[in-house]
Structures are given as structure tokens and as C-alpha cells.
Regions:
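Phosphate-binding glycine-rich loops of NTP-binding sites
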Residues: 92-93, 98, 129, 145
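Conserved D-loop/post-Walker B switch-helix segment of ABC ATPase nucleotide-binding domains
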Residues: 121-128
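Hydrophobic "anchor" residues on beta-strands that sit immediately upstream
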Residues: 108-109
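C-terminal lobe/lid and adjacent interdomain/linker elements of RecA-like ASCE P-loop ATPase modules
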Residues: 71-73, 128-220
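Conserved D-loop-proximal element of ABC-family nucleotide-binding domains
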Residues: 116-120
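Phosphate-coordinating catalytic segments in nucleotide- and nucleic-acid-processing enzymes
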Residues: 1-94, 100, 104, 195-198, ...
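Walker B catalytic acidic pair
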Residues: 112-114
Length: 220
């Protein structure tokens, strides 16, 4: 069979270009972060500054395999071990290299539980990078899982951008978008609806235990 068909090759290359962020394996991220490209390193620092992580640079000690963030205080540079940073700062520093790479090259980046240990404002900032056409000039995409409710709003996402995972009767996970959900009158969920509030009310197929608790029922 001849697989050398232009459209198939193009699709294959697209899948190969996808970036899967794995916090358990930071080696690839380090290779990106410690690139010799000075302009790229400046972009990482600028992005950190944008979310109030006040660093002026960073340094990697190859001998001890340790990362240090640098801060300018009264004209002097002070260093802090990456391990001593807050969990939110560490996660942001770990995620930024692949996020910026995706934006720079127009790729898809996949991140599991992006909101974990991340302040809601930082999460919204990451999302805004991909939704801002002046920043995301090459059509990069972000696919992430989250339990965060603060971003489940019509001002942040369209209905077709929000997807739910629910267990069916065979204990299989099924996914469906908010756009697919129909109300009792067979109309779609309004694009101006309070998505977070309606989700907690169980209108989108909320977890049955959550629905029961919110209704004041017994759950133990």
C-alpha cells in the first residue's frame, strides 16, 4: 500500500507536531528553556513578568542540575533555587517553554490538569495567549483538562470550546461539548448563559454525587 499521499503526509506531520506537556519528564522543556536563542529566553522572562512573577532572568547549573531564578534588587542580582519557589510559580515556569514554542510555531499543545496549583488569574492568562490574535499569529491551539470553574464562562470560551467527560452505564468515559447539549425545549444552551452556575446545577450532566450533595441529599 502506498501511503505517500500528500494529504495523509500532511495530517501525519500535524499529529507529529503536537506537544504533550508531561510534568513528570521535564527534560524536553529544559532543552527549550535553556536554548541559546537570547530572544526566546527574553520572551520567557517577559511572560513571567506579565503574571507578576518578578524575575529578571534564570540560570541553570549544569554541574548540580539545578535551576535558579534571578531577581534584580537595588541594582544587585539575587538568585533563588527553583525548588524554593511557590508551587504556582514552579508550574508556570515549567509550562511556559512549551506554550511559547506552540505559539511561535503554530502547534497544538496538550496539558493535563493545567489548573492544578495554578492561580485562576494565571490560568486565564495562559488561555488569553491563545485567544489573542496579536499574540497567536500562527493559529496555535491549547487543549487542556481542568476542574476550574472560574474560566467556565461565556466571556472566556465559546460553547464548542468547552467539553465534558462523563461516565456512561458501561463505566466508559464519553465526551461531549457544551454546544451539543439540548434543553427540554430542544434548544441549545444560550451563548450568554452562566455556564459555571448551570454546570453546578447539574444541567450539563454533572457528577451524580455532586448533584446529590448540592440538593442536600445523603452521599455517604
Amino acid at each position: 500500500i502506498n501511503y505517500d499521499i500528500p494529504v495523509i503526509v500532511e495530517v501525519q506531520k500535524w499529529f507529529e507536531s503536537c506537544i504533550v506537556k508531561n510534568y513528570a519528564n521535564p527534560i524536553a522543556d529544559r532543552q527549550i528553556m535553556f536554548s541559546d536563542d537570547e530572544s526566546y529566553r527574553k520572551k520567557i522572562v517577559r511572560a513571567l513578568n506579565d503574571v507578576d512573577i518578578d524575575v529578571s532572568g534564570y540560570r541553570y547549573d549544569e554541574e548540580n542540575h539545578e535551576l535558579y531564578t534571578q531577581r534584580m534588587i537595588e541594582g544587585k542580582i539575587y538568585e533563588l533555587s527553583f525548588n524554593d519557589e511557590s508551587d504556582g510559580t514552579k508550574k508556570m515556569i515549567a509550562a511556559l517553554p512549551v506554550i511559547l514554542l506552540a505559539l511561535q510555531e503554530g502547534r497544538l499543545v496538550i496539558i493535563d490538569e493545567l489548573d492544578a496549583k495554578l492561580h485562576p488569574k494565571l490560568l486565564r492568562y495562559v488561555i488569553s495567549l491563545f485567544k489573542n490574535k496579536n499574540v497567536n499569529k500562527k493559529g496555535a491551539q491549547l487543549l487542556f483538562t481542568s476542574h476550574d470553574m472560574t474560566t467556565m464562562k461565556n466571556t472566556v470560551f465559546r460553547r464548542d470550546e468547552i467539553w465534558f467527560a462523563a461516565e456512561n452505564e458501561r463505566h466508559e468515559s464519553e465526551i461531549y461539548s457544551l454546544y451539543e447539549i439540548r434543553r427540554e425545549n430542544n434548544e441549545r444552551v444560550n451563548s450568554t448563559a452562566a455556564y459555571d452556575k448551570q454546570y453546578l446545577e447539574g444541567r450539563y450532566g454533572a457528577d451524580p454525587y455532586l448533584t446529590n450533595m448540592l440538593a442536600g441529599g445523603e452521599w455517604l
